[in-house]
């Protein structure tokens, strides 16, 4: 019995699937060091006042664990996963996995612009420089 993954229509039948990379950005909003640095550089001391910058936006729902499991099961053709982070990592993450490339913000953002908490800048710059 063949299990349908939902990816069959995207996969070439001749197994000549091009290798691609995934880029994923992640932040642990519960990290006290990250919170402290964010507060120090924030224009607005009370982050809850600004709708777009609420603490809930940075909450770790632990969904990343399932995302990695899904990639491993349904997208084995992925060549590399570039994991872009402020510097912290989930405790459960296998840092030695051969497909994983851990990228710190300081690896691709010029020092004069760090730290940055602008997700748009992080995402666009990581796509260009990784």
Regions found by a protein language model. Give the residues of each.
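A short, glycine-/small-residue-rich helix N-cap motif at loop->alpha-helix starts
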Residues: 59-63, 110-122
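N-terminal anchoring/stem segment of glycosyltransferases
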Residues: 2-107
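Conserved small/polar residues in nucleotide/adenosyl-binding loops
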Residues: 128-130
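Short, hydrophobic/aromatic alpha-helical segments in well-folded domains
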Residues: 67-70, 121-126
